[in-house]
Amino acid sequence: MMYSISNAERELQAKSVDLNPRWYPRYHLAARAGWINDPNGLVWFDGWCHAFYQHHPYSNQWGPMHWGHARSKDLVHWEHLPVALAPEGPEDKDGCFSGSAVVDGDTLALIYTGHKFHGDPADENNLYQVQCLATSRDGIHFERQGMVIDTPPGMHHFRDPKVWREGESWYMVVGARVDDVGQVRLYRSDDLRHWQDAGILAQAETGMGYMWECPDFFELDGKRVLMFSPQGMAADGFARRNLFQSGYLLGDWQPGQPFVREEEFVELDSGHDFYAPQSFLTPDGRRIVIGWLDMWESPLPEQQDGWAGMLSLPRELSLGANNRLLMRPAKEVEGLRRDWFPWPVSSLKNQQLTMVERCETMEVNLHWDTANSCAEQYGLSFGEGLKVYVDNQMQRLVLERRYPQYGLCGTRSVPLPTGSAL
């Protein structure tokens, strides 16, 4: 098949007509039709927040990756734009993989991984991943500039560049895999086109994964955060229950100096579906993160409806007193609110109380008096398969989903915080 932006747009126009909207998100960002995974190129440019994403417009299955594109004035109401990148060049003939976006003067620059095989795709020795550049003056139509970093010798998995400006230089981190050890590699440039290898920023220790995908590196409240998505970490009790994780290392770094870790790897999200998060700065200086709300090899019942996957709501990051990242919905999410009503203070004993009927979307703000409840479990049920509750015996907050007809069953939980209120 010949891939191009015009062919992708024709396919999306046809498929969006037949899309079944029953489960299509009402306020999360999803593709017009087809497949979506990693968020890419989250950036403010010319008064708009631009969100690019990994996209297969020809199918609801993963396939040769394109870059889908949407923009928003408020982070919650999105306007779909034409596909930004298609795998139509020699350097990315098998896919335009994940990357990032930066503003360089009056130009919006996309830096992404060109994915290609030189021979049989079943043989990983034929895999080559290079870093590429595309630029735009209007933020919609992009001119391909070709490869800017070649695959390092002896390496095959080398992807997901994240670029930022620091001082007078551009810096880039790239995820890598060397002898089944995950790495984040560092590069420096004066012009986004000519890059110098600055070495290994961080590398997996035993048990920390064979590949580190989608790295992000930024300053937050005086600390440096290396956020990435490791593959190959084993589950440990309640932790790391998903196939792959997303999380971070905290430490200190200055240009030209090594990254000095201060903490162990910490998962960023303890739910079922959150992967490949990327961050960006708002014009007022807030650090916002958006992730992919699915997981590789998980059932995707929406595929039968002509689409697959969506992105998370924007979350604002901050650093807590215990050196842990805190996430809360960005303040722009409040713009989705409409009618509201209070629920009465309730004390129940082996009872159920219906609070809302026939509600399609809602926001719930809860205050639970955990210190004065003697119930083994108490919480909320949403519809027929979703529960959020406190388990007093385990002293954990639990999210349970049970949709056996779709293969979506299981629980995720976190310890209850100290104190009497939740």
Where are the regions that the model predicts?
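Short edge-strand/loop segments of extracellular domains
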Residues: 136, 234-235, 381-385
